[in-house]
């Protein structure tokens, strides 16, 4: 498809933001090389990062879009191998954006526990204690199914021996959920490194109280 004609302006704007956020994952140390992937839903189309292309090389002409079943809508590059993962999330949630990374501390935690203990009140911002989806080969329908279950009533989860996945109503929110999860994993690893103390954890009631406050958070 001609990138100067026939591409909606809304898609072009969304692609620009997608590329900026993709580059931010590298700058913030959440991915290495071409690992990780991002997508954003625009109407009935999903814009997604391509497979194996360094984010600093992505240009407007590289815009890549598929439909909700993964069929090509625009672009000539192959989509990320994790497309099934993204499609599963859009199919099972109201997500408008998805961010997948190989963040160091989060990936380390994914090898240690089945659920990230509620060590910080911002656990509530992700819907509750963050689950770890069982390991499955990247890009597989099995991994997509495990992730769908781990994300039930959550906006982020860990992928065993793999990384993180988070979604949001905007790309910015999905990225913030990703960064928050990586920070909490770093916090948990730091706290559990003590040989003399055990980290204090929050109760369900604690998290419910925070959820209520977060619902009214921000400027009116």
List the predicted regions and their residue ranges.
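Glycine-rich flexible loops
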Residues: 1-220
């Amino acid at each position: 498809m001609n990138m100067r004609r026939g591409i909606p302006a809304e898609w072009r704007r969304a692609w620009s933001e997608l590329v900026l956020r993709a580059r931010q994952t590298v700058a913030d140390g959440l991915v290495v090389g071409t690992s990780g992937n991002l997508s954003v839903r625009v109407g009935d189309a999903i814009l997604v990062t391509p497979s194996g292309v360094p984010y600093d090389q992505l240009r407007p002409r590289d815009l890549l879009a598929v439909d909700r079943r993964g069929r090509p809508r625009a672009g000539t590059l192959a989509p990320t191998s994790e497309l099934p993962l993204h499609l599963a999330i859009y199919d099972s949630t109201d997500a408008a954006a998805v961010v997948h990374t190989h963040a160091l501390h989060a990936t380390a935690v994914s090898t240690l526990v089945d659920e990230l203990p509620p060590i910080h009140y911002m656990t509530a911002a992700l819907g509750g204690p963050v689950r770890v989806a069982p390991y499955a080969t990247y890009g597989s329908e099995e991994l997509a199914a495990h992730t769908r279950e781990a994300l039930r009533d959550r906006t982020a989860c860990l992928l065993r021996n793999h990384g993180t996945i988070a979604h949001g109503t905007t790309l910015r929110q999905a990225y913030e959920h990703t960064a928050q999860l990586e920070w909490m994993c770093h916090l948990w690893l730091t706290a559990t490194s003590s040989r003399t103390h055990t980290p204090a954890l929050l109760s369900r009631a604690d998290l419910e109280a925070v959820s209520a406050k977060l619902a009214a958070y921000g400027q009116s």
